[in-house]
């Protein structure tokens, strides 16, 4: 059974459900910005978010996903203890782990790991309560908890295909001093993992729950490593959009894509880097749209790509589809493929891994694709890559007989 790593928690961050009848896939795949659990009189002076795609060590091997590091500078008008946290729905892993076949993995945590938090340089721990369980009096009195129970509609929630019975509250107590307070936290999470793509969604419109409803000085960094990624355009409440800056080397460009349920095409950033990261900095950040990032794992299986980017880069072509379906090609289809085409088809797995071709024709051909960023001769292929090469080589050998 396929393991589902559900990106729910984004440690010390928050997803408040104001509409439990919302699209369940989107709902359960989002984390978000930490918020005050009671009405806040605190201002966010600065915030820096760093998303880094990487694998980390886990009990069962290496866990793919993204490491998140966030640094806040808050301005508090007075000293005192504050409750800060988030509410998130039950993970789909609970139902998955109820299957006897999967109980041996019941102690695994697929939501997040390597969690660290500090307030003004001192480490703090996170408290967790399931909202179907008994809640301490001080927790039940928090405004966000009362709001959750007031808005929870069991009948509407039960109508969803994947019904979450209730949620969890995660929070920490911060002893703030008057004036500036620094909160730092980091963690690793797995996102929603699939054979075609991994999705990492992040709710940050909840910035509006803080007193100033914005971040005075904001910066976000996305470090994708060698992943091919897409990030839908993000608009801010002032009408401006997030314009990503490439710090490093690689290919980035925009295309237009229609997502499921949308009537119009969205402007989407595509990026494949050799080194470096994407960055956005601004003053008075107040987002209208949420952050969404998709790691594209299988180009030949992706359901939709724009034909070209704004700069003219391509994403895929007929020869790629032929290469990954070589064993299914019919005789009349094979006749249309030249020997030169077969050589290109055979080298697609190498190109996708960033192989730096010495053959100028091959290098020129693959350079038209945004995802082709040569990194060297030593690239790692997997079993399915060798299967593609093997299938094409069979066709080449048959022509020599």
Model-identified regions with their sequence ranges:
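Bacterial N-terminal signal peptides that target proteins for export
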Residues: 1-8
């Amino acid at each position: 059974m396929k393991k589902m790593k559900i990106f729910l928690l984004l440690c010390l961050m928050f997803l408040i459900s104001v509409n439990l009848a919302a699209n369940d896939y989107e709902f359960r795949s989002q984390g978000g910005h930490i918020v005050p659990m009671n009405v806040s009189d605190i201002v966010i002076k600065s915030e820096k978010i760093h998303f880094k795609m990487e694998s980390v060590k886990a009990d069962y091997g290496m866990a793919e996903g993204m490491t998140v590091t966030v640094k806040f500078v808050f301005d508090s008008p007075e000293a005192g203890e504050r409750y800060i946290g988030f509410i998130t729905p039950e993970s789909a892993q609970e139902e998955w782990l109820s299957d006897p076949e999967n109980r041996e993995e019941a102690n695994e945590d697929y939501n997040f790991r390597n969690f660290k938090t500090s307030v003004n340089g001192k480490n703090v721990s996170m408290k967790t309560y399931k909202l179907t369980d008994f809640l301490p009096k001080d927790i039940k009195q928090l405004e966000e908890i009362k709001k959750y129970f007031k808005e929870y509609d069991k009948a509407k929630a039960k109508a969803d295909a994947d019904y979450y019975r209730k949620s969890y509250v995660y929070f920490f107590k911060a002893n703030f001093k008057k004036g500036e307070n620094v909160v730092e936290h980091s963690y690793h999470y797995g996102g929603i993992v699939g054979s075609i793509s991994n999705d990492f969604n992040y709710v940050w419109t909840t910035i509006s729950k803080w007193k100033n409803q914005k971040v005075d000085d904001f910066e976000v960094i996305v470090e994708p490593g060698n992943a091919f990624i897409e990030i839908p355009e993000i608009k801010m409440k002032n009408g401006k959009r997030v314009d990503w800056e490439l710090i490093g080397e690689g290919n980035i460009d925009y295309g237009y894509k229609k997502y499921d349920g949308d009537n119009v095409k969205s402007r989407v950033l595509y990026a494949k880097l050799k080194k470096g990261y994407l960055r956005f900095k601004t003053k008075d950040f107040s987002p209208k749209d949420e952050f969404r990032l998709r790691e594209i794992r299988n180009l030949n299986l992706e359901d939709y790509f724009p034909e070209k980017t704004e700069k003219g880069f391509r994403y895929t072509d007929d020869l790629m589809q032929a290469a990954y379906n070589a064993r299914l090609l019919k005789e009349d289809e094979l006749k249309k493929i030249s020997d030169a085409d077969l050589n290109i088809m055979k080298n697609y797995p190498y190109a996708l891994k960033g192989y730096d071709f010495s053959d100028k024709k091959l290098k020129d051909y693959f350079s038209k694709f945004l995802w082709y960023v040569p990194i060297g001769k030593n690239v790692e292929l997997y079993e399915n890559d060798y299967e593609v090469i093997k299938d094409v080589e069979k066709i080449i050998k048959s022509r020599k007989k």
